[in-house]
Amino acid sequence: WVVSRLGKGVVRALDTPNFVANRVGVFSILAVMHHTQQFGLGFDEVDGLTGPLIGRPKSATYRTADVVGLDTLAHVVNTMQSTLPNDPWHAYFTNPAWLQALIAKGALGQKTRGGIYRKVGATITVLDPAKGAHRPADRDIDPDVAGILKLRDPHARFAALRASPHPQARFLWAVTRDTLHYCAVQLEHIADNARDLDPAVRWGFGWK
């Protein structure tokens, strides 16, 4: 009835913090935030990399955070931080200083007409955390990295990302590596089998 009449799917999850979709999806967001800083990339640059090019929604990562609400995201992160003290990736479960600063100013994302992104007239601007100010957004992707992402064979695509010295490629490899590793380690704690994980992130976060 849920599937045929409501058009919804059922995800069987174990009783753990954030269940399946949020546990994996929010971890992926945190991995993106961590490696954004590690590789010195811009938020708009990262959204260009983590959207449709890798089978995720156009809103990608930071724009998705704005849509969800930065205060809501911070609450979910705080839940992970306080309830999962033994998680091997616990160091990732923290709200960056720039995120806390936006929340303190009441810049919560789309619902307050400004957060990580902000529209000024006809111009979309994005936060530069180093300067604490917004600048015009530009999702510029290196042509070589874009070429790697067009490779149809996943093995060849991941191998090329791992081998590339370009920061954008190294960033994508690091995020993919961490997310897959996290799923492999935590699967037994959050779901009965791997088949329950894939629909959870497809339906919950729009991943393909």
Describe the residue ranges of each PLM region.
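N-terminal glycine-rich phosphate-binding loop for ADP-containing cofactors
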Residues: 1-208
